[in-house]
Every structure is written in C-alpha cells, then in structure tokens.
UniProtKB/Swiss-Prot annotation:
Motif ('HIGH' region): 127-137
PANTHER family reported in the protein's UniProt record: ARGININE--TRNA LIGASE, CYTOPLASMIC, ARGINYL-TRNA SYNTHETASE
One matching Pfam family: tRNA-synt_1d
Organism: Psychromonas ingrahamii (strain DSM 17664 / CCUG 51855 / 37)
Gene: argS
A cellular component annotation (GO) from this entry: cytoplasm
SMART domains per UniProt: Arg_tRNA_synt_N, DALR_1
Reaction(s) this enzyme catalyzes, per UniProt: tRNA(Arg) + L-arginine + ATP = L-arginyl-tRNA(Arg) + AMP + diphosphate
Oligomer status and interactors: Monomer.
Compartments where located: Cytoplasm
The name this protein goes by in its record: Arginine--tRNA ligase
Length: 582
C-alpha cells in the first residue's frame, strides 16, 4: 500500500519539476506513515514540508500543488492537508475490497517478490562448541532465523552461516582431559553425554594442576600444527557438540542445519593470508610485538588511533582475523550483496572496526552492505542477566523443557478431556512458541525480562494469545462446514469494523518489507497482535455465521479466512507453528 502512495507522489514530483516549481536536482526520500487518528485518513506524508525550503514555497501551498498534480487513482478516495503541510490520504473502500479479494486467492497474500533479489549472508547463532547452548544463544538463533525466513519469503537468496566457535585455546584443555579419560580406559562418548559437566571437569583440572595446564597448552600447539591424533579427538568432540546444537535447533524450530555450519576452523588456512594481504597493502603496524591495523576513525581518550590486533606477539590469531577471513570468503565465494551479523550489542565496537579494516583492505566490495544487527540481554526478574536459581547460566534445553512442562499444566487445566498425545503436542507448541515469541516481540536492541508467567499468558502480546486467535477462526469455518480457502464471493465492506480489519490486512506486505530491511521481527509481532485485536473487534460487532444476508456472510467469512491465513503466514516467518485447536 505504501508503495502505491509513494508512486503517486513520485509522479506528482515529476510534474512539478517540469513546471519548474521544484528544482530538478531534488530527489526527496518519500516516507509514508500510518495515521494514528482515523479522522486524519489512513496514511500521511510530510513531502511538502521537506520540499518547501528548496522550492521556496509555503508548505501548505506546496501541499496543494502536490495534490493537484497527483494522477487520478482508484486507490485514494480523497486527500486533505493537515497542520503546517502534511498530506493525509483516505483509502477508497472499493480499492480495499479488490486488494482483499486478491490477497485471499494469492498464496503469498499479496506480499511482493523483490524486484532485484539479493544474495544475503546471515551469520547467526554461532555458539561456542566447548559448552552446551545456553540462554545467551537464544536471541541470535531465533531473531536471525526469523529474519532469514522473511528475506527468503521476499525472494532473496539467503545463505545461512553458523560461525561456531570450534577452535581456540580452550580446546587444548578439553583435549588434555579427553586424553586422561582415554588413559584411564573410560569411554569418551559417555563423558561427552553432558558437555557442561565435561567442560567443568576439564576446567577444574586446568585450574588445579600446572602439569595438566602445561599439557593443554602443548596440545593447542599440536592441534594447530595438524597433529592427526589431536585432530581426531577434536573432531569427536565437535561432532558430539554439534549434535547437541542440532537437537536444540530442532526443538526451537530454527532452520539451521549441519550444512550451514562453517566454523572458525574452516578459515585456519586463510588467517596467514589475511595478515600477508594487510601487510602488502601497508595497513599493518607493529605494536608491542603484535601486528595491528590502526584506524583513524577510532581513537582513545588521548586522541590516538585504536589498534585492531590481527596477530598476537606469540603468532596467535584473534577473532578479528577469522572474521576478516570469513568476510573475504562471503564476498568472493558466496558473492554476498548483504552480510548480516546477529551478534550481541556488546560486540558493536568490534564489528565497526573489523568492517572498516575489511573495506580499507578491499576484502569486500564498496556496494556490499555489512550490517551488525545487535541485540540486548535476556534479564532475570531480579534485573540481572538471566541465570538459574543456583546462579548458573541457564541451559537452553532446560528452559525449553520447563516451558513445555508449564504449558502442559495450562493446557490440561483448560482441556481435561483431551487425549494425552494431543495434550503433549499442544503443550510443546505452546511452550516453545511462548519462549520464542516473548523474545521476538521485543525490539531486539533492548534488554528484556524473561518471565514464564508473562510469556505463557493468554492475554496481551503473547504466543498463546495469537495461537488462540488462529484457532478461533478455524472453529468458525468448522462450524460453517466449509474449507478456509473455498469462499468465492467478493468482499463488500460496509461496516467500520470491516474496513478497519481490511485496512490492517493489506498492510502485511509493508510490514514484511520493514522486517526485511531493518532486521526487526518485533514489527511483525506487533502487526499480528494488532491484527488479532482488530479481528476480535470485528467478530463482536459483525456477526459472521448469523449475518443478515448470505452475501454478507460470505464476505465476512473471506475476511476471517484472510485473517487466519495472515496469522499463519506471519507466525511461520517467526518460526512458530499454528494449532488447529487448543
């Protein structure tokens, strides 16, 4: 809808340039906003205010000229000027009706494919394989996945990259412990069943025994040198750890697969090449024995350029080195147009610096967009980063299990006659969806409080509320005895609540565009919540199955059907499955 209005305004600007009312070199960015007050129309624009100064015109007078030069369209029934020069657009109900009829028949619900699809690389989840996935991995995994699904739905070629931490000094400690177990004749597989216990045991040995710590350091050197025995143990550990990750992804409904894994170790043979390239270009400087790139745009308190360390004094490499190698791979091998990083906000400076080094070195093209998509912290109800009652970092698998158990009790209370298998299935969907939606519905840049009571509520902007809203529409069609997609009559919008619902339904394309461009799934969550609320108001004010006429009944069934389809598609893009009944 916004695109249609934007096109009308663009045509008006062309006319005004020809009339020499607006300077020919003006290329304004046209923003279309939803109005909050329906008396001011459906959409508003501040174009006249933006162009008034360069056009040397009074804003309200310029708004009149813009309106006069907008071509006739079935889209708009009238336009009004408000305040200092805002242009308000009132959408024609007849246009709405045609849009609803079209969306109902369209599998894509009128969501447009990108005119110029891109190859978009998305780096998300990326856990450290030394430990089990914990609550800190939740946000990157599900926010990144929702954006990946949305960009794919828009027709882009999305390449998922799970940049797991499968290399580094901590693996020397783990290998040393694996060697100890093997020497004792203990099966390594049994000990790897619980990665967290295994890691703590290895860390305990490392801290308490200098001999163990020395062996661990030697094993890191052997591993990095390609020692076959070390690599074999390392591969065994990674295989087990990746299997744990994949189980969690499947439970979470995250679309990452083993084929998407490209860990730090996959760039090992490119790290020295990165250093050599930077050196050849004269970008490297020695600082206290380390090789660094100094960036003029990043300075300390004294005004001196900050270093990005590329290679340590002892010859070791850092995250910056592997990130630069990954960027070159993603540019040269994957031909990325955009590279998105869903990583904690605390890594903001790191990415700003690495992006600048990559551009300075020509590792990425000028047109390639490098975007850090930061997110905040999951907090406990005590206002501190979320932990278990014992103070330990909460395992993601344990959180999901607790969510399912709590959801089971809620569902069982409401459906005492339901069979056990169905109860378990519904509880699993409700529990997992609640954890995901509680996160996705928050602006990703903000911290949020993790609360089972809030996320499992059937009131407010929650997964249970939206899942129930969907089942409510399903039950209407069940009572009517017809399939949801079988309504053939045209929509007729005569009541205020019908028009309100229709207006919201045709915004779906705009919302999907917004999520795709900004990487913000909470926009979609807010839209779905508002849509469910408007459907509830429509349902109360406009009887469907007992409508006054058959024509009215069919029209309202179509509105209800499109609402359900939109809820289902929207939730699917968030990685959430719907239920036929709750």
């Amino acid at each position: 809808m916004k695109v249609h209005i934007q096109q009308l305004l663009e045509q008006a600007i062309v006319c005004l340039i020809k009339q020499e009312i607006i300077p020919a070199d003006i290329q304004p960015r046209i923003n279309i906003d939803r109005t909050k007050d329906k008396s001011h129309g459906d959409y508003a624009n501040n174009l006249a205010l933006m162009l008034a100064k360069p056009a040397k015109q009074n804003p309200r007078h310029l708004a009149e000229l813009i309106i006069a030069n907008i071509p006739e369209s079935t889209l708009v029934i009238k336009m009004e000027i408000a305040g200092p020069g805002f242009i308000n657009f009132f959408i024609n109900p007849n246009f709405l009706e045609k849009q609803i009829d079209g969306a109902y028949l369209d599998k894509r619900l009128n969501v447009q494919i990108e005119a110029n699809p891109q190859t978009i690389v998305i780096d998300y989840s990326s856990p450290n394989l030394a430990k089990e996935m914990h609550v800190g991995h939740l946000r990157s995994s599900i926010i990144g996945d929702a954006v990946a699904r949305t960009l794919e739905f828009k027709g882009n070629n999305v390449v998922r990259q799970n940049h797991v931490g499968d290399w580094g000094t901590q693996f020397g400690m783990l290998l040393a412990y694996m060697e100890e177990l093997r020497a004792k004749g203990e099966p390594i597989e049994n000990n790897l069943a619980n990665l967290e216990i295994f890691y703590r045991a290895a860390k305990g040995r490392f801290d308490e025994s200098e001999d163990f710590a020395t062996r661990a350091r030697h094993l890191v050197v052997k591993l990095q040198g390609g020692n076959k025995d070390c690599l074999k143990l390392w591969a065994k550990f990674n295989e087990t750890s990746l299997s744990h990750c994949q189980e969690t992804y499947q439970r979470l409904g995250v679309s990452l697969t083993r084929a998407d894994v490209r860990g730090e170790s996959s760039y090992n043979d490119q790290l020295a090449v990165v250093v050599e390239d930077l050196d050849k270009q004269g970008l490297l400087q020695q600082s206290q024995g380390a090789k660094c790139v100094f960036l003029d745009n990043f300075k300390n308190k004294e005004g001196d350029p900050l270093p990005v360390i590329i290679q340590k004094k002892d010859g070791g490499f850092l995250y910056a080195t592997s990130d630069l190698a990954a960027m070159r791979y993603r540019q040269n091998e994957l031909n990325a147009d955009r590279i998105l990083y869903f990583v904690d906000a605390r890594q903001g400076l790191h990415f700003q610096q690495v992006f600048e080094v990559a551009r300075s070195a020509g590792f990425v093209n000028e047109k390639t967009s490098l975007e850090h998509m930061p997110f905040g912290t999951v907090m406990g109800e005590d206002g501190r980063p979320f932990k278990t009652r014992s103070g330990a970092v909460a395992k993601l698998a344990d959180l999901l299990t607790e969510a399912e158990v709590r959801a089971y009790e809620l569902v069982k209370e409401k459906n005492k006659e339901m069979s056990e298998p169905e109860l378990r299935h519904i509880a699993s969907v409700v529990g997992i969806s609640s954890v995901k939606y509680a996160d996705l519905s928050k602006n990703r840049t903000s911290d949020y409080t993790f609360s089972f009571d809030s996320m499992l509520s059937f009131e407010g902007n929650t997964a249970p509320y939206l899942l129930y809203a969907y089942t409510r529409v399903v039950s209407i069609f069940n009572k009517a005895g017809i399939e949801m997609g079988s309504v053939t009559a045209a929509v007729s919008l005569t009541q205020e609540k019908e028009i309100d619902l229709a207006n919201k339904l045709i915004q779906f394309n705009d919302i999907i565009d917004q999520v795709a461009k900004q990487g913000m799934p909470h926009f979609l969550c807010s839209y779905l919540f508002e849509l469910a609320g408007l459907f509830s108001s429509f349902y109360e004010a406009c009887p469907i199955l007992i409508a006054e006429t058959e024509t009215q009944k069919q029209s309202r069934l179509k509105l209800a059907g499109l609402t359900a389809k939109t809820l289902k598609q929207g939730l699917s893009l968030l990685g959430i499955n719907t239920l036929e009944r709750m």
